[in-house]
Amino acid sequence: MNKNLSDFLQKPANVVAPLLLGCILEREINGKTIRVRIVETEAYDETDAASHSYKGKTPRTEIMFGDPGYLYVYFTYGMHYCCNVVTGKKGTGAAVLIRAVEPIEGEQYMQDIRPVSGVQLSNGPAKLCQALEIDKRLNGHDLSDGPLRLVLQDPVDSDLITQTKRVGISQAKDVLWRFYLTGNEYVSKV
């Protein structure tokens, strides 16, 4: 694990979530590079009834309780994968869901994988996982190394970030732990 990345991600999930906006995910697939900008995130931790880690460590959530900077991938609705960046100190059960990304390099290759165009390509957590071929094989992956890397960027000005309620959850609905780049067309739901 890259020390700078680990140090950056050791903060609580609700602190890291807005800081990930504007950061880059680089995905290597079959010798091709795809680069996307993170435009929407949601924070979760073990104190949060909406979090997978709320009821403690299980085989499914073990990654969330590990070191920061690893990928937590889960299968949902019997058909889709979603990916999260583990945050906080080891043992805290915290992660940030990547809800939407904007292609900046390799968009055509993403469309070859997920044959849709425009914002529908990656404006949701399952859509971006399909377009980047993120599945259970990457669960526990170190995000400082290939084939999927998180590249930190300078923080986005807070005036350009919207903070609101999270999407598609049945518990802790009023917690304002969803963050997105205001006005970005790739945001899943406004």
List where the protein language model places each region.
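Conserved, well-structured core segments that form or line functional sites
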Residues: M1-V190
